[in-house]
């Protein structure tokens, strides 16, 4: 019988008052200078405002001394719908993402991201002989087929929200991830979660004008039966060129086919490389085919996710909504029955949270 899987408390272990007495593995890791250094480096990366690919590369280097790995994948999720919004990786799984989408959304497997987000521990490992690994499709049909035999997954979550995930991979012949290494990965989750939230909304420069809406018809075999010119233009602004279809397109199509999340928000809000806001949603055409629509995200579509990413309060969101509609401070104050001074205070907080300095910058950052 396999040994139990790793289960580590979902907390910043370096700050936990009981960790040294209650978890020998955690105590060993926290006394290890390399683990302390990795935590400090990741905390600094979270504050460095790096481009996505650079963040992933620097993160891999920072973790390499305490959790050695050959490949990594850093992922972001829409906090409302749970659809994938970005990914950066190196030496990881190649080819069409359709098989991974099927594993993550339809198959029963160990350590799916949504499962890790709900469990006491946000970390899970494959390839160490844990109970149930002999029946893991991801391990035997995906990882091993591509030359990997060990996987560590870390859900980046707080409270009830899944913001992103980190996947570390080891090639065949490499040792399994240890309990100490799982603890070290868990310890960097809080600063890495903050970094992922910032990357999701970051604006670099003035975005170009929005592109027209586009559509993709996804067939029963998860291939594109038709892609409009407009959809292809959107994909070139946020997806890897070598992908037949972006992961999020197939993920949205799978959710539409199965009715997962029916009646709920199933929109992926994606900040593209150029700074545009894209809204992506899918609807079934028949039992086999799905239409995926890509178009500029509207203000009303963006606000729920922006409120989550930036931690806007309900009142701050009220002020922001009216500001984006073109109302002046006096008009906002009158509509919300507040003093102009109070509205100004709310705006100052919005500037701070979004790292902007004026109405114009704030509006540009959120459109």
Give the label of every model feature segment.
Residues 323-327, 366:
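Short helix-to-turn junction characteristic of helix-turn-helix DNA-binding domains
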